[in-house]
Amino acid sequence: MTAFVLLHGFAQTPASWDAVVQQLQAAGHRTYVLDLYESKCDLKLLSTEGALEDAEQGKGVEGDAGAEGALASARDPLASLGAVCDRVAAIVRLVAQADGAPVLVGYSMGGRIAAETVVRHSDLPLAGLVLESAGLGPADEAARVALAERNGAWAQRLREEGVAAFMDWWETLPLFATQRDLSSEVRVAIRAEREAHSAELLARSLEAWGAHHQAAEAATLSAVSDLARQGVPVLYVAGVLDEKYAAVAARAHAVGVPVVLVPNVGHNVHLESPSAFGGIAEGVLAEGGFVEGALA
């Protein structure tokens, strides 16, 4: 049994991981799904099956004053990218106390936060790191400035137009083109999830957690590569139809980060092909590791 800590993407909720959670639990693993937008955090509520009950009684989780103190101090995750990363790191350490080092999995914005957490907390106890369609930071200062301007414009649009109008536009972006082929039931659920958040909350997350605050891509790749050299399985996952993040995957692969490109899917691999993604995440733990490359 291994624990998995899962971080959702922009305008998502923990429910976005439901299909993957079911697959991992069926294989005997424990799952902790963090609501990145929640201002308060009770670790017991993160467990999708109450996995911490035994830990509180006998494994000393409550006695980990350092991790608990860090979690308490990071209760306003929207203060900054550093604040949400500190919170993720504290949760990872508490889960490690309860269940052993977990696999940290992040999608898109959640993947950026996972990667930045590794940059800022090099001593994090991890059994694996899976980054799905995640930006790894600006290439240079010009890119950082452009990202800051873009995220600021998006935040302003949210505040001026509201969530519904913003999402009408958001869903037309080429990044989400493949999601238009999903069933109407799934698309309705995605839209409801996106509209569950307030415009101000989403705007603040763009301003506080945007890619313009990340370490440069070279620094992120260095930290992720260092993790792999320490024997921690690391994997970057992208959909073949997502040209932007398939290119990020290629740059990661060029410096030795293992990559899996999943065919016939776009940006959100775990939504468009949950069984494939669940198998990839679980495969990080397999003896000999996952099979790198494009899946047939």
How would you describe each model-predicted region?
Residues A3-H8:
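Short beta-strand element of the alpha/beta-hydrolase
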Residues G106, G110, A114:
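Gly/Ala-rich beta-loop-alpha elbow adjacent to hydrolase catalytic centers
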Residues E195-R251:
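Conserved serine/cysteine hydrolase catalytic core
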Residues L104-G106, E132:
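Short beta-strand immediately N-terminal to the catalytic nucleophile in serine-hydrolase-like folds
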Residues A15, A19-Q22, A26, R30-P102:
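Active-site loop/oxyanion-hole signature of alpha/beta-hydrolase fold enzymes
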Residues L129-L158:
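Flexible "cap/lid" loop of the alpha/beta hydrolase fold
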Residues G9-Q12, S108:
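Active-site glycine-rich loops that stabilize anionic/oxyanionic intermediates
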Residues V265-P274:
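Catalytic histidine-centered segment of alpha/beta-hydrolase-like enzymes
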